[in-house]
Design a protein with these regions (language model features):
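A SAM-dependent methyltransferase catalytic signature shared across enzymes that methylate proteins
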Residues: 151-168, 180
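A short acidic, Gly/Pro-enriched loop at the edge of an enzyme's catalytic core
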Residues: 89-100
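Core SAM-dependent methyltransferase catalytic element
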Residues: 169-188
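A short SAM/SAH-binding and catalytic strip from SAM-dependent methyltransferases
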Residues: 100-112
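Class I SAM-dependent methyltransferase SAM/SAH-binding core
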Residues: 41, 46-90
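Conserved class I S-adenosyl-L-methionine
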Residues: 1-35, 49, 129-156
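A short glycine-rich, Lys/Arg-flanked "PGG" loop and its adjoining helix->strand segment in the class I
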Residues: 114-128
Length: 188
């Protein structure tokens, strides 16, 4: 267990203020752009907000989280998804199990950025997308010293073997789109 992990209430993860900051529709558009996907792994699924969003788009969704109470909440919100307990650095899935691996505001909680990115690479078939808090002081989210610098994420992604690594600054968040192979230029 790491002190960087979210230990708060489930309800807070779905607060209207927090959801508005995440730009759910825009993030889904960017995550799904330029690739045909059937399966998604939602790492650090929490209350299942992202699992629910992907499932509503017809994708087969599996969520993983370290907290049993989060998994129970996620299952209640997304009964047609599969949820499993596990840690992002040692995911309980075979290589290339999911077309997309998604991390919604959890990559900064990894005990090691390089280790986590390598593990995401291992279980992803096509793409990894991480939504993160920007590297700045903010009223919501983790303290700045837990947040990730864009240059660090991109450097470690390339070192992990990703063929394409992109940082997209959203209105309130940072999005990292990491592809295992060179795909067609992204059209969004």
């Amino acid at each position: 267990m790491t002190d960087k992990r979210y230990g708060g209430e489930i309800e807070r993860l779905r607060s209207p203020e927090r959801v508005a900051l995440m730009e759910v529709d825009r993030v889904l558009e960017l995550a799904l752009a330029g690739v045909t996907l059937k399966s998604v792994l939602d790492v650090g699924t929490g209350s299942g907000l992202w699992a629910e969003a992907f499932a509503q788009r017809g994708l087969s969704v599996t969520g993983v989280d370290v907290r049993e109470d989060m998994l129970a909440a996620a299952q209640a919100f997304v009964p047609n998804a599969t949820f499993k307990q596990g840690e992002m650095e040692t995911l309980p899935f075979p290589d290339e199990s999911f077309d997309l691996v998604f991390l919604g505001l959890v990559l900064h909680e990894a005990t090691g950025l390089a280790t986590a990115l390598r593990e995401m690479y291992r279980v992803a078939n096509l793409r990894v997308v991480a939504l993160e808090w920007p590297y700045e002081v903010g009223e919501m989210g983790p303290p700045q010293d837990h947040r990730l610098r864009a240059e660090d994420v991109l450097r470690e992604a390339r070192a992990a073997g990703y063929a394409q690594a992109e940082h997209i600054q959203l209105a309130h968040m940072a999005l990292y789109r990491l592809d295992k192979r060179n795909l067609q230029p992204w059209c969004v």
